C-alpha cells in the first residue's frame, strides 16, 4: 500500500477520469493528480482554490520492486552513456528486457553525429522530453524518424514495435507518449554525448528520477572493432571514433567525472564494464538490476541472457556466408566477443595503444600486456572495476 498527493477542486466541477494515469488508484474520479515532486510543488502553487487530499493506492509488484527513488510517484529514468563499439546495443537490449520498461535507442541521433558542442543544451532538452514521455513535442524528431527508417530507432524498442505495428501507429506522437506513460522505467541509450555533459541533467532537470549507467569497454577492443567493415566506413568520419588519441583522452576525462559521481551520487551512478558482463553475464546483471532497484534478475531478463550470450544468431550466420561478420547483432558468444581483439591485433599495435590509453586502462582496471604470450593467453588479468576506480580516484 502506498500514498499519492492529489488536488481536489473546491468547485463542484469534475475532472475527467482520463486525466488520472495511475492504474489501480481508488476513488480518484473527481481528483486532478499531481505526479512528481516538482509537479506537486507547481500544482500546489498554481491551485490556491484547491485542497490537498492523501489517497491510498495499491502498487503492483513490479513497481514495488523498484527502490532508491527520490520521487516515488514517477517512473525511474535510466540513461545509458557510452561510445561506439562498446557493447551498448547489447546492454540496451538487456535493459529493455526488464519488466515494465520502455526503451529509446539513440534518441539523439537526429541532432547530429556526434552531438556537437553547441547542441548539448538541446540534447539535454531532448532527453528530458524522452524521459517525461513527451517526444511529440520535440521539433523535427518524429519527422526525422519517419524519414530515416533504415536506422530502425523505434524498431529497436522491441516491445513497443510489436504493439505499435499492429495498430499502424509507430510514428504517431500521441500514441508513443501514451504508450510511454504506461511504463515505470524509461530507458535511453546514447553514444552521442560525453559523460560530463550527461551528468548535468542531474542539475538542470532535478525533477527526473535519474540513474546513469556509464558503460566502459577496453579501448583496445573498441578500437579493434571500429576497424572492421562496415563500421569503419562511418567511423572514419568521426575523429572521436577513429583516432585513439581523441578517444582515450575522452576516456581519461570521463574518469574525472566518474570520481566525482562515485563520491557524490553512488546511489544514482554506476560504472558497468562490458568485459564483466560478457565473462560473467548473470553475476554482473545481478549487480546491475540491484542498482536499478530489483531484488533479483527478473525471469524475462534471465531468458534474454540465456539466448543472447551463448549463441550465434541466425542473422550473423547469414552474413558469415558472405565472408562478413554482422557487427550490429546483439546475439553473441559473449566471452569470445569481449576478448577477440587479443587474438586479432598485433602485439605492436596493442603496445602502442597501451601507451596512448594508459590512464584509461589503469583507471578502469584493464591489464597492460608486456609479452605476446600473456596477450594471446585465455587468462583474464583485469582487476575489479570498483577497486580500480577507487585506487585511481584516491591518487587523482
Residue positions per predicted region:
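A short, glycine-centered helix-capping/turn motif at helix boundaries
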Residues: 83-89
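Cytochrome P450
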Residues: 101, 113-116, 204-206, 265, ...
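A conserved segment at the C-terminal end of the G1
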Residues: 89-100
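PAPS-dependent sulfotransferases, especially Golgi type II membrane carbohydrate sulfotransferases
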Residues: 1-78, 84, 151-161, 227-230, ...
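PAPS-dependent sulfation machinery
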Residues: 104-195, 233-236
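PAPS-dependent sulfotransferase catalytic domain
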Residues: 161, 166-167, 172-302, 309-329
